[in-house]
């Protein structure tokens, strides 16, 4: 099965998503260097749910307990594993601001998760957990023990919610055929 080539639900304009959601989408576009993002203007059609989802998503990233770089590594790994170009392109830009290097991006795509591959022990444990969540929808005892040796319980819960959220988001993006946003050059 493959994702649709064109949007199944087109991004909405101001009238479709409401003035409040439109304002939010425009502000988020300015922050990300794009027009109002297609993801937000599509989900904005579900007006109240959109704002609730945005609050939840914002509490995970950028407002979560995990360092921003680690959150971006999680999101990029999920985007890669799911083949979600929209999230990959968006978070390559955001990840660069959080310290994700070109080397990190290469390693994320070859799915190496050890200290020998250049990750810190904490990053390796996080990425191994994300991989297990993606492939089996749970984390085994050994990987969980490794993860918990690096993350406190609040961080561990947040990691599960962050990875699960971006799995859900990839499903939504791919199913709806949400197209990548054109990137505006700042100059």
Language-model features: where?
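Hydrophobic alpha-helical segments
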Residues: 1-187
């Amino acid at each position: 099965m493959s994702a649709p080539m064109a949007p199944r639900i087109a991004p909405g304009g101001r009238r479709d998503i409401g003035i409040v959601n439109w304002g939010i989408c425009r502000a988020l576009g300015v922050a990300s260097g794009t027009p109002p993002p297609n993801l937000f203007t599509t989900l904005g059609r579900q007006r109240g749910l959109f704002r609730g989802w945005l609050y939840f998503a914002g509490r995970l990233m950028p407002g979560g307990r995990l360092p921003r770089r680690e959150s971006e590594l999680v999101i990029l790994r999920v985007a890669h594993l799911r083949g979600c170009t929209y999230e990959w392109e968006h978070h390559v830009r955001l990840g660069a601001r959080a310290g994700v290097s070109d080397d990190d991006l290469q390693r994320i795509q070859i799915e190496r998760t050890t200290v020998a591959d250049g990750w810190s022990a904490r990053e390796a444990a996080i990425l191994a957990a994300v991989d297990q969540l993606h492939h089996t929808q749970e984390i085994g005892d050994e990987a969980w023990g490794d993860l918990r040796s690096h993350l406190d319980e609040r961080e561990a819960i947040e990691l599960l919610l962050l990875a699960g959220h971006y799995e859900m988001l990839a499903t939504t993006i791919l199913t709806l055929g949400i197209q990548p946003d054109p990137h505006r050059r700042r100059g």
